């Protein structure tokens, strides 16, 4: 069974701070709700819950606390393996029912690297990137986009209106 994920941010924000990460998370959640019917968010980190510390972990914890109090269905900080695998998440102290479908990366570097590795090594089909936060949907296609990529991106851009 195919699994769909929203990865964010993979293309735009070079210097992420707490406010930008919060906006990225909200926009990605809105896109997931429109395209996938639900949004369950992982705020990704090298740390799960309290297992590590540092500036990026502190930023993720603050975004988590703000958005959790606003009613978002999210988990974080959480490592990638725990975001994908419920059994690993449980061993690390995180419990979720449905699968997580929105992956929020702590930096453009992490997001872009993960997106390209999934596409190349994991044979994931990637569509986009979609630029969020604009009045109208915007898709930024790679110079290596195929005809199928262009058609799929166009269909999803229209669906997100």
Locate each region found by the language model.
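Anion-binding alpha/beta catalytic cores of soluble intermediary-metabolism enzymes, centered on
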Residues: 1-161
């Amino acid at each position: 069974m195919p699994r769909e994920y929203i990865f964010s941010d993979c293309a735009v924000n070079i210097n992420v701070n707490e406010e930008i990460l919060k906006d990225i998370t909200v926009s990605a959640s809105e896109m997931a709700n429109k395209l996938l019917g639900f949004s369950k968010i992982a705020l990704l980190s090298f740390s799960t819950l309290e297992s590590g510390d540092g500036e990026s972990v502190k930023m993720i914890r603050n975004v988590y606390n703000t958005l959790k109090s606003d009613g978002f269905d999210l988990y974080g900080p959480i490592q990638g393996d725990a975001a994908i695998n419920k059994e690993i998440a449980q061993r690390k102290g995180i419990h979720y029912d449905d699968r997580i479908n929105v992956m929020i990366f702590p930096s453009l570097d992490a997001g872009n690297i993960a997106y390209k590795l999934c596409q190349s090594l994991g044979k994931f089909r990637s569509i986009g990137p979609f630029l969020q936060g604009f009045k109208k949907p915007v898709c930024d296609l790679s110079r290596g986009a195929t005809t199928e990529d262009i058609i799929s991106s166009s269909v999803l851009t229209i669906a997100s209106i």
